[in-house]
């Protein structure tokens, strides 16, 4: 029987919150820290020393002996180096535990050991981590013991961003600056900044760890590279929202406890559509904190899974034939005095501020659909997007019937006098209440959907950091706000000017709205007619980062320099090539050392059976037929393995960069698929006791 939980006491117990600062810091110090958090600026070194001492004392009280600058390099995961609080013993030989303001504010990791796209080399290795004061420090409890983790940004010696956080923070400042101009136009003089709020729904698979460790593909690539479909998949729709199995429920319970300790507002948990697939979702929070917390969610899922004898698979497509995993990025913008700029109110057709914000977002998404698509691209997501399980690779906006009708009225007549209502839902059961329906349905096929008072960006991959998507979203909307504010701030007749601007933006960018079925082939054709970009793969999307349009956008708002953009493009090309190379070599290894030898053993057993049956005077048609089929597929597989290895050698010998990445996409991936086909066919033919590793049925249904 579990002990009773006091969630209120447990929540954020391992976080150095504002409340703990208020208790432990002198009043003047706390006031300075709070002012820097709210208004920006730098802490004095004297103040940083006081904060560092208080933080260290709190951490030691919670069992920590070490601290780390916790940052997010371009690997997409987090990085940390642990330093103890110990200093040189005093003259009496006593150890003194210290932590200075300088150590709190700045660290110096080796920048050349992380992806930099040419910005750093081994002979110019210095990099800096700098404390993000707006994201609270926390204590992470792992097998190494409790460690004080200080969220930081990571940059080069020359100040170039080498991480996911620095551009995000820059984009948040840019968005706030431009959004404040918009709210000032409507008389809001109290707000001092506008924050993007984010809530990321995290999907994942859980499989038995002992079984997963028998498969090299899961170990090395995080997904299955071979595997015939199980007799049952997700076609019965019985896993989604189904009863959570006890083993999985115990895992989820422990995950919640760990996340609540870390201040992560884990709110919702449920089974997802595919067998062995699940989801956890938090409550929204400031974008930079949400990015940090999503990294903690992914780390915690993996760590707790191990304690339960499970393996958490975060790959976007770990199993062929069933749904992959995504990460719905719920995004809204809110003033510091509590006004959500995406709240339409009861009469959105009359809410001019909301309509202007909506028009600006339509303009932003239409103008920079290619960049938004790129922000959600990674190697794993290529297997998921557009696969009748996830949004297509074409960016469009779903507004729902009510708002689409408002937009249509404004475009056609310049005014929106009518508003579609939701009507009553009547169940026909006397004991069930009737209630007013929402004015619009949901569209699960849309990549960018308005869902009441936020936009849900559904393209993001499950394993990816949400830093890049939110950086891009903030940047493109900041640009649209800036252009709108430039037009309206000096207007002689503001009411007429804002009316005309809303109509202009909605007319010019109405093509980005699509409320239909994003999975339909007809949508691809319609999108092409509308002139919307359809970028099919990660490698094809990378170039969008270095177009003149993108460089102008990011440089204008101080989010990226051209050098930073080009370096990121190089990192993405290299990441793609390295990932596919690992997968290709893993496939060859599994084929030559596991599958082919296992099939040959089974073939021998069939041949022995033919001889025995012949000697007994029996009919050998069945074993002969089976042996013939298996031999044919085995020959096909051996040739495909040789061909894949040859393509891999050619690709790996090429200079790193765009051309190599495209070679892996166009040649190596094709060869990988050609090897998988006969292997999966053989799995269906070979006696299970001979097959060298667990099958889809073993992994997905024996958890």
Identify what each model region corresponds to.
Residues 1-8:
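Short, compositionally biased "basic patch" segments
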Residues 76-92, 109-112, 117, 215-217, ...:
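Short linear, low-complexity motifs centered on an aromatic residue
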Residues 47, 71, 100, 282, ...:
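Active-site proximal loops enriched in glycine and acidic residues that flank catalytic Cys/His/Asp
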Residues 505-703:
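C-terminal amphipathic alpha-helical interaction region
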Residues 64, 68-70, 291-307, 333, ...:
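Hydrophobic/aromatic-rich, well-ordered segments within soluble, folded domains that form packed cores
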């Amino acid at each position: 029987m579990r002990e009773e939980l006091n969630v209120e006491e447990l929540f954020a117990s391992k976080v150095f919150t504002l409340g703990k600062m208020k208790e432990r810091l002198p009043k003047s110090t706390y006031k300075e820290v709070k002012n820097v958090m709210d208004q920006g600026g730098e802490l004095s070194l004297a103040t940083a020393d006081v904060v560092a001492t208080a933080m260290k004392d709190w951490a030691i009280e919670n069992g920590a002996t070490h601290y780390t600058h916790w940052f997010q390099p371009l690997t997409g995961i987090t990085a940390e180096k642990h330093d103890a609080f110990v200093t040189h013993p005093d003259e009496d030989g006593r150890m003194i535990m210290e932590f200075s303001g300088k150590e709190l504010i700045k660290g110096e990791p080796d920048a050349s050991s992380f992806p930099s796209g040419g910005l750093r080399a081994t002979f110019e290795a210095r990099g800096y981590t700098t404390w993000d004061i707006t994201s609270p420090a926390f204590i992470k409890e792992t097998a190494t013991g409790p460690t004080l983790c200080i969220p930081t940004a990571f940059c080069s010696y020359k100040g170039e961003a080498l991480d996911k956080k620095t551009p995000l923070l820059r984009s948040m400042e840019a968005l706030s600056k431009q959004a404040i101009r918009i709210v000032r136009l409507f008389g809001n003089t109290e707000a001092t900044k506008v924050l993007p709020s984010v809530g990321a729904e995290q999907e994942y698979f859980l499989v038995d760890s002992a079984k997963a460790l028998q498969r090299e593909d899961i170990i090395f690539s995080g997904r299955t590279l071979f595997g015939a479909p199980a007799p049952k998949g997700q076609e019965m729709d019985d896993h989604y929202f189904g009863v959570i199995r006890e083993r999985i429920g115990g895992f989820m319970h422990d995950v919640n406890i760990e996340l609540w300790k870390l201040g992560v507002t884990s709110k919702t948990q449920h089974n997802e559509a595919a067998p062995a697939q699940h989801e956890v979702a938090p409550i929204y929070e400031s974008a930079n904190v949400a990015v940090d917390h999503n990294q903690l969610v992914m780390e915690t899922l993996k760590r707790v899974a191990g304690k339960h004898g499970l393996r958490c698979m975060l790959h976007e497509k770990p199993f062929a034939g069933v749904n992959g995993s995504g990460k719905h990025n719920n995004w809204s913008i809110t003033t510091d005095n509590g006004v959500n700029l995406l709240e339409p109110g009861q009469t959105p057709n009359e809410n001019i501020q909301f309509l202007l914000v909506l028009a600006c977002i339509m303009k932003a998404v239409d103008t920079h659909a290619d960049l938004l698509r790129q922000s959600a691209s990674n190697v794993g997501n290529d297997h998921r997007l557009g696969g009748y399980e996830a949004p297509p690779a074409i960016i469009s906006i779903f507004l729902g019937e009510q708002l689409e009708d408002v937009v249509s009225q404004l475009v056609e007549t310049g005014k929106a006098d009518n508003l579609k209502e939701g009507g009553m839902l009547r169940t026909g059961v006397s004991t069930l209440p009737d209630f007013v329906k929402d004015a619009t349905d949901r569209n699960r096929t849309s990549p960018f959907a308005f869902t009441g008072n936020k936009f849900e960006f559904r393209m993001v991959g499950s394993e990816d950091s949400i830093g890049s998507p939110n950086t891009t979203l903030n940047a493109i909307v900041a640009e649209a706000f800036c252009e709108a504010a430039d037009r309206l701030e000096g207007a002689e007749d503001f009411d007429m000017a804002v009316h005309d601007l809303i109509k202009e933006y909605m007319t010019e960018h109405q093509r980005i709205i699509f409320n239909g079925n994003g999975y339909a082939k007809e949508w691809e054709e319609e999108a092409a007619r509308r002139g919307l970009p359809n970028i099919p793969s990660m490698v094809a999307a990378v170039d969008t980062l270095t177009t003149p349009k993108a460089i102008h956008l990011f440089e204008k708002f101080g989010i990226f320099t051209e050098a930073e953009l080009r370096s990121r493009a190089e990192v993405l090309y290299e990441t793609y090539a390295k990932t596919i190379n690992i997968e290709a070599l893993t496939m060859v290894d599994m084929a030559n050392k596991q599958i082919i030898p296992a099939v040959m053993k089974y073939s021998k057993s069939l041949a022995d059976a033919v001889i025995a049956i012949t000697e007994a005077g029996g009919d050998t048609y069945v074993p002969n037929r089976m042996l013939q089929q298996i031999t044919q597929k085995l020959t096909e597989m051996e040739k495909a393995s040789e061909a894949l290895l040859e393509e891999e050698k050619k690709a790996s010998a090429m200079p790193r960069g765009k051309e190599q990445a495209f070679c892996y996409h166009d040649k190596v991936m094709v060869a990988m698929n050609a090897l998988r086909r006969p292997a999966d066919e053989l799995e269906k033919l070979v006696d299970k006791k001979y097959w060298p590793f667990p099958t889809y049925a073993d992994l997905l249904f024996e958890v």
